[in-house]
Amino acid sequence: MKYLLPTAATGLLLLAAQPAVAANTGGYATTDGGETSGAVKKTARSLQEIVDIIEAAKVDSKGKKVKGGAYPLIITYNGNEDSLIKAAEKNICGQWSKDARGVQIKEFTKGITILGTNGSSANFGVWIVNSSDVVVRNMRFGYMPGGAQDGDAIRVDNSPNVWIDHNEIFAKNFECKGTPDNDTTFESAVDIKKGSTNVTVSYNYIHGIKKVGLSGASNTDTGRNLTYHHNIYRDVNSRLPLQRGGLVHAYNNLYDGITGSGFNVRQKGIALIESNWFENALNPVTARNDSSNFGTWELRNNNVTKPADFSKYNITWGRPSTPHVNADDWKNTGKFPSISYKYSPVSAQCVKDKLANYAGVSKNLAVLTAANCK
C-alpha cells in the first residue's frame, strides 16, 4: 500500500489552523478535543496505528488502566487508502458483506482529536462509543465496507460533546439487490444516537450517500441537541438527518440532489432550518414513516421562502400512502427554543456561491464569514 506523507509545511499549517481551544464549534458541542496542556501528539499511517495509540493512552506509565484515559490525545493521520477506495468503487455491491473496518474510540473521556493531513484517505470509519470530548477533522472517508455489520463512516453512540468538522464522506447513491428493500450498499455517513448529545457536524462534504445520518436509534432514543452547519450534501437519498425527537439546528448548509427525502422530523422533534440553500430536492423537509408523533420545524431565511419558489429551484414532493406531513406549503409548524450558543449565519445566497471553497478536506480548516460573501 502506498502512503502519502505530508510535508512539514503541510503539517504545521494544519496544526496552526486548529485553535488551541476549539470550544467555539458554531454549535452545541464545546469540545477542545484534547487540545490542552498535557496533550500527547502522535502520528499514525494506518488504522492499526491509530488503534494502538488510543489503547496505549488508556494506561499510565506503570501499565495501570486509567478510567477515561490517561492523557489527552491529538493524532495526526497521514495514511492513504486510495487503492482500497478505488477497488471498492469497482465492486459497489460487494462491499455490504465485507468485514467492517473502523477505529473505535471507546470509554475515552480525556479528550481526543483525529486530524487528517491533506492528501490522506481512509477506507475505514471512526466509531465513538461511551466517550466524550472527541474531534474528527480533515478526514477523507470513502466507500466504507461492512454495511451488514453497521459499517458507518462516523458513528457516535452514547457520547456527548463531539465535533465532526471539515471531512469528506462519499460512496455511491445506489441500490443493490439482495434484501427486501434493496439496501445492500453502504451504511451511514454520520449516525448520532443512543443518548449522544451536544454534537456539532460542520463543514463536511457528503456525497453519493444513500442514508446520510440518524439522529436517534429508535423511537425511545429521543433526547439530544445537534447542530449541522456549513455542510454540502450532493446526490444523497435521505436522512438529512432522520430526526427522532430532540433539537436539530441546521444552518448554512447546501442541499443539491436529494433523491428520497431530506429532513425527516419525527417523534416530536423540533428542527430549526435556517439560511440553507436547497435545489434539485425531493421532499426536502418532511415527517414520514412514523405513527403519529410527527415533529415540527421552523423555516428561517432559506433560499426557498414560498411554494412559488419550488419550480425555480426544482423542489418536488411525493406523498406516501402512510401518514406524513410535507413542508409543501413552506410554513412553520413549530417554534424552535432559544439557542445556547453564539453563531453568525451568512445568507443562503452566499452559501450557494462560496461554501464549496470552505467545506470538505484540504481547505486548511477555513471557515466562511460574512466578509467572504462580498
From Swiss-Prot:
This is Pectate lyase 2. Disulfide bonds join C93-C176, C350-C373. Residues 1-22 form the signal peptide. It catalyses: Eliminative cleavage of (1->4)-alpha-D-galacturonan to give oligosaccharides with 4-deoxy-alpha-D-galact-4-enuronosyl groups at their non-reducing ends. The lineage of its organism: Bacteria, Pseudomonadati, Pseudomonadota, Gammaproteobacteria, Enterobacterales. It is found in: Secreted. Pfam families: Pectate_lyase_4 (PF00544). Its cofactor is Ca(2+). Pathway: Glycan metabolism; pectin degradation; 2-dehydro-3-deoxy-D-gluconate from pectin: step 2/5. InterPro entries: Pec_lyase, Pectin_lyas_fold, Pectin_lyase_fold/virulence, PEL. Ca(2+) binds at D150, D152, E187, D191. Its main location: secreted. The gene is pel2. Involved in maceration and soft-rotting of plant tissue. It comes from the Bacteria. One of its GO terms (cellular component) is extracellular region. GO terms for biological process: pectin catabolic process. GO terms for molecular function: metal ion binding; pectate lyase activity. The keyword Nucleotide-binding does not apply. Belongs to the polysaccharide lyase 1 family. PLADES subfamily. Its EC number is 4.2.2.2. The keyword Protein transport does not apply. The active site is at R239. Transmembrane segments: none annotated. Coiled coil: none annotated.
